[in-house]
């Protein structure tokens, strides 16, 4: 991107990542590379609440606009609350500063408030009306990222791409803030991948979920049960409760048929993907389609 002058540069947060022999030598070098954006943009829009914001802005040449839920900023959020109604989750909050309004977003989690604020601020700076911003925000969804499917007013069904310990802990922590009656996880593990990741996935889901339904993900060249046996090592560490249903659609159907009011069912690992990779072949499989088919079958009395 050298030589390109951006209209806006955005900073939301920074954590140690992409550090290693083939990437960045240190966190400091990683942050320095990120900070270059604010020397080649006209306006920098930054999260004033992130502990690394000063490092990111070191040497900046742009005009700076800030957003925050904790301190004075160009755009501020307050009175943050959770939406949990008719099987739909989200956040609502008040906005002051360069905008003055009430906002809501149907993506659960506190991080959604920050993502909403930066979106609102950039759109406001670009001259978009407050009404259009709020309408767009109320309708936004991100495919495969805490994506809710409208299945029932009694329970919530969510698709998320989380497929390692860090991302899984993050999404489950977010959902636990909504106080589900039961948190049920449906997932497997990727074949030809680290066993350590499987142990960790089993341990964190066993710790945080009320029930884990082990099933097929992308087994690739491995057997589903071999992969899930590794996951069970982690489940044993956290004394997690589980069942095994190899067919992913059948695993989802089991959870939907046995859901109780207030339950949250989380389909982990596939997210935006629309296939399963088995023995070198990619078979079409979209969880959204599978859920719709199961609903139709349940209505027709076939399940």
Residue ranges and their predicted role:
Residues 1-59, 193:
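Flexible active-site lid/hinge loop adjacent to a nucleotide/diphosphate
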Residues 1-5, 85, 204:
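Short glycine/proline-enriched loop/turn "hinge" motifs that connect secondary-structure elements
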Residues 13-17, 69-72, 218, 290:
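Short, acidic/turn-prone active-site loops that include or flank metal/cofactor-
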Residues 19-20, 54-55, 74, 222, ...:
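Glycine/Thr-rich phosphate-binding loops of Rossmann-like dinucleotide-binding domains
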Residues 21-31, 35, 42-43, 58-169:
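Adenine nucleotide phosphate-binding catalytic loops in nucleotide-utilizing enzymes
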Residues 48-52, 69-70, 272:
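Short, polar loop motifs at secondary-structure junctions
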Residues 61, 98, 121-131, 135, ...:
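ATP-dependent carboxylate-amine ligase
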């Amino acid at each position: 991107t050298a030589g390109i002058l951006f209209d806006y540069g955005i900073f939301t947060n920074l954590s140690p990542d992409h550090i290693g022999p083939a990437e960045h030598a240190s966190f400091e070098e990683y942050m320095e590379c990120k900070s270059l954006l604010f020397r080649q943009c006209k306006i920098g829009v930054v999260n004033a609440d992130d502990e690394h914001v000063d490092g990111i802005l070191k040497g900046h040449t742009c005009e700076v606009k800030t957003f925050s839920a904790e301190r004075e900023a160009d755009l501020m959020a307050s009175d943050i609350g959770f939406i949990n109604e008719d099987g739909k989750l989200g956040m609502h909050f008040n906005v002051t500063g360069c905008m003055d309004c009430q906002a809501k977003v149907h993506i659960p989690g506190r991080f959604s408030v920050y993502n909403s604020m930066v979106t609102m601020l950039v759109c406001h700076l670009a001259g978009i009306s407050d009404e259009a911003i709020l309408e767009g925000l109320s309708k936004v969804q991100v495919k495969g990222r805490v994506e809710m499917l409208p299945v029932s007013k009694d329970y919530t069904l969510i698709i998320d791409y989380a497929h390692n310990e860090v991302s899984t802990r993050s999404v489950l922590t977010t959902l636990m803030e909504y106080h589900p009656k039961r948190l049920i996880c449906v997932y497997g593990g990727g074949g030809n991948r680290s066993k350590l990741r499987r142990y960790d996935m089993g341990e964190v889901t066993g710790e945080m979920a009320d029930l884990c339904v082990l099933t097929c993900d992308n087994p690739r060249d491995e057997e589903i049960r071999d992969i899930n046996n590794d996951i069970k090592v982690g489940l044993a560490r956290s004394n997690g409760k589980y069942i095994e249903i190899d067919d992913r659609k059948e695993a989802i159907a089991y959870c939907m048929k046995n859901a109780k009011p207030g339950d949250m069912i989380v389909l982990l690992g596939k997210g935006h993907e629309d296939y399963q990779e088995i023995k070198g072949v990619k078979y079409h499989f979209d969880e959204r389609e599978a859920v719709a088919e199961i609903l139709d079958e349940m209505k027709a009395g076939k399940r």
